[in-house]
Amino acid sequence: MDFVTAANEPVQPASTCAPQTVTTRVQTSSPFLTTGVDYAGPISLRLGPPRSKTTTKGNIAIFVCFVTKAVHTEVVTSLYTEAFLAALRRFIARRGKPMTICSVNGTNFQGAANELHAIYKMLQCTSQIATVQDFLATEECEWKFIPPHGPHFGGLWEAAVKSMKYHLRRTLGSQVATYEELCTLLAEIEACLNSRPLCALSDDPFNPTYLSPGHFLVGQPLTQLPAADFTDVKCNRLSRWQTYQQQLQQFWQRWSSNYLQSLQQHHRWQRTSPNLQSGYLVLLREDNTASLHWLTAVITDIHPGKDGIVRVVTLRTPKGTFKRSITKICPLPRANGEL
């Protein structure tokens, strides 16, 4: 191939097959024994009482368990090493001491905005890295960095950051929360993320239960105190506490809808997949569901079309039996690994 021809050929980046799943993600272990950590931010914080006009920039530290995909969040009020270590100490006190902590490399964000780049100055300063590693050494923890300019190596925690940050920004908008309000909101958002169904617990059609990250943390599904629905109420009619409840409900609606869509195969109209069968546990895509409440149902009958493809099913729920299009349900992976 001559030089002119070679110059006109599109240059493709090197690629290879995806690696096998990391061993630490498939071995039996306690939650957060191997943990990924990342920052989401910056986010505005109000100093003092709710009516105070003094604000500052804070960030959110997100810890993700490699095995259970459980999420833990902490508010970090500054970019100093001491603030990160304080968040790390709170995490260890509540979730237990991890054996390995993985994080991004600061050079991944060399070309990012100044605010985002400032978050990772801590990870680029040799003295600050030494401070954090000295603390981890006393706790017998190992800290690993992913390769520079390789953010896809941290896809596990990047997905958690994206899942929370996108909807949190849309929910808060221009409102500025106090430290206590943000901590409370993040704790309940954390419960939302940890309540998501992962798979069916059994193949018994009369036991429609699912497994969630919350089961690994508290041994049972996460629940929440009931609250009035403030989703469509104007903000000027709500108290400060009701506004917080509205933000949480709006986050739940947006995030749960997005999560249910991710469970459905986007290529369902272009590529055939095995027909659904009776006895499958599914999630219902319904509007205005309460926070941390996932509507489950069991397929009792299927209705194939003339081409033999199932597009309508009969479902059994605690409230009765009815038909639904398969576009309104999301099948969960079964106990035997099938979908």
Regions found by a protein language model. Name each.
Residues 1-166, 223-229, 234-339:
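Retroviral integrase
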